[in-house]
Amino acid sequence: MSGYMISPEYYFIYWFLKYYLSPMIANASPVLVKGIHRIDFSHIFIDGKPLFGKNKTWEGFYVGVLMGFLTSIGIGIILCEEEYILIGLGSSIFALIGDLLGSFIKRRMNIASGEPLPIIDQLDFALMATLYYYFLGIEEFISYPLYILYSLIIILALHIITNNIAYYLGVKDKRW
């Protein structure tokens, strides 16, 4: 934990922002660019379907990594925890890999690019970021399983709300 004393009633907010803000920003950022270079290079998987689909581009991935990294720099500076900067970068990359994994699963299920798959669409990135923290064995993270559960519920709700806002603002073509 940082050098600051945080009262118990605010600790969850601190914890949530520290561990999930960078992955959330990374996951939300690719929509800011209209990429043309597909991550799957238009390759077809052995089942005859695209690996990820037309909406997963290198430009979006790079913007996601950059925005997640910038967020982790901010968090690291605010919390006086420089080591968090690399941890946040890693969680951002894992979040984007989680999003790709979700797209891979959707293609296997014959769900077209841009079409919804509830729960997977909202939580794939957060589950991969969670797995990343477990891989690293970050005690402050893994010691709070209820915080993880609460966080996933909050992320699910936030994802639905922010996607609807982005749709109504014209940033996204679909509400999901």
UniProtKB/Swiss-Prot annotation:
Record's subcellular location: Cell membrane
Enzymatic reactions: 2,3-bis-O-(geranylgeranyl)-sn-glycerol 1-phosphate + CTP + H(+) = CDP-2,3-bis-O-(geranylgeranyl)-sn-glycerol + diphosphate
Requisite cofactors: Mg(2+)
Pfam family, one: CarS-like
InterPro entries: CarS, CarS_archaea
Protein family per UniProt: Belongs to the CDP-archaeol synthase family.
Protein function: Catalyzes the formation of CDP-2,3-bis-(O-geranylgeranyl)-sn-glycerol (CDP-archaeol) from 2,3-bis-(O-geranylgeranyl)-sn-glycerol 1-phosphate (DGGGP) and CTP. This reaction is the third ether-bond-formation step in the biosynthesis of archaeal membrane lipids.
Lineage of source species: Archaea, Thermoproteota, Thermoprotei, Desulfurococcales, Desulfurococcaceae
A GO CC annotation given for this chain: plasma membrane
Protein species of origin: Staphylothermus marinus (strain ATCC 43588 / DSM 3639 / JCM 9404 / F1)
Pathway the protein contributes to: Membrane lipid metabolism; glycerophospholipid metabolism
Taxonomy, superkingdom: Archaea
Record protein name field: CDP-archaeol synthase
